């Protein structure tokens, strides 16, 4: 039987009443730490892109738990910092690019042997600039330099591949970025850039709005001409060493959404975007003959 001196017992009792049990742990902190260090992880889904990822209950972590290899964050330059949100009205000084994405990614990479996923799958952070492109890039570039140990970068035209690839979308400061002798980010092109002679390390991705290129929205079979055009776009991008992404595809659970996702996957589109993490994860795993709880390793194609 454990004996405790009366005075010490009273002290411990009062202390526990004031601050809670000595062994109590903040569940939120414990849960987030587990996300960073847990050796068991979801199967990496190289085609899965989390559109407006910051809208989820736990930005970044919900996407990682579902195996997403690409996430998107909209940013505004406010008083020298990059705040994350879709509009000025929803910005919060505590929700920054560093706090929501760069810091937790760096923690995970350090804990995971230099990778976001243990199998080494490429991970993309798409930064959609909503404020002035040039002014925001200057701040973003300095910020990214602090995280260079995990970031793919280009020095004097030579690519140094690392765990996380940053791509800038939205208001893109093309000239300033292109002239930067050391870059920690590439730039998101458009379909009009498909045959551009810009190097793939400067423009590693081609993205555009789905209904600007296609009329088909998942109802009935995809017309042969549009199916051929989709494959042509992917082939042309591959020829120039670039990846492909479309935004604003159907995203409400429906046969139409499944039909569009199926065509994107069959054509080899690299990033399939969604707000429905569970839905896209389940779809991609079903195409791979796996379950949502699979804990297996897959190989991925190395990209810039």
Where are these regions (language model features)?
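A structural motif detector for short, solvent-exposed N-terminal "entry" segments of globular domains
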Residues: 56-61
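Catalytic cores of phosphodiester-bond hydrolases, prominently lipid phosphodiesterases
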Residues: 24-45, 62-69, 76-304
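Bacterial N-terminal signal peptides that target proteins for export
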Residues: 2-11
């Amino acid at each position: 039987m454990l004996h405790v001196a009366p005075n010490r017992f009273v002290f411990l009792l009062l202390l526990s009443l004031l601050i809670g049990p000595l062994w109590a742990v903040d569940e939120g902190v414990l849960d987030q730490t587990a996300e960073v260090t847990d050796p068991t992880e979801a199967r990496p889904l190289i085609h899965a892109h989390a559109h407006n990822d910051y809208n989820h209950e736990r930005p970044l972590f919900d996407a990682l738990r579902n195996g997403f290899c690409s996430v998107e964050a909209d940013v505004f330059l406010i008083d020298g910092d990059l705040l994350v949100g879709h509009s000025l009205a929803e910005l919060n000084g505590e929700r920054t690019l560093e706090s929501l994405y760069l810091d937790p990614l760096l923690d995970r990479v350090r804990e995971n042997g230099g990778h976001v996923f243990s199998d080494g799958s490429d991970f993309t952070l798409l930064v959609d600039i909503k404020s002035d492109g040039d002014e925001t890039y200057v701040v973003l570039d300095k910020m990214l330099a602090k995280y260079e140990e995990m970031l793919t970068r280009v020095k004097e035209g030579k690519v140094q591949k690392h765990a996380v690839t940053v791509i800038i979308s939205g208001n893109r400061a093309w000239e300033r970025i292109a002239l930067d002798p050391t870059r920690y980010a590439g730039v998101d092109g458009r379909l009009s850039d498909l045959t551009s002679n810009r190097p793939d390390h400067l423009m590693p991705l081609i993205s555009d709005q789905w209904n600007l290129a296609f009329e088909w929205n998942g109802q009935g079979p995809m017309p042969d001409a549009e199916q051929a055009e989709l494959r042509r776009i992917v082939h042309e991008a591959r020829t120039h060493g670039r990846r492909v992404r479309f935004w604003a595809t159907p995203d409400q659970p429906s046969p139409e959404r499944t039909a569009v996702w199926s065509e994107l996957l069959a054509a080899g589109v690299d990033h399939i975007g969604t707000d429905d993490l569970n839905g896209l994860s389940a779809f991609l795993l079903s195409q791979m003959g796996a379950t949502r709880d699979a804990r297996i390793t897959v190989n991925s194609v190395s990209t810039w």
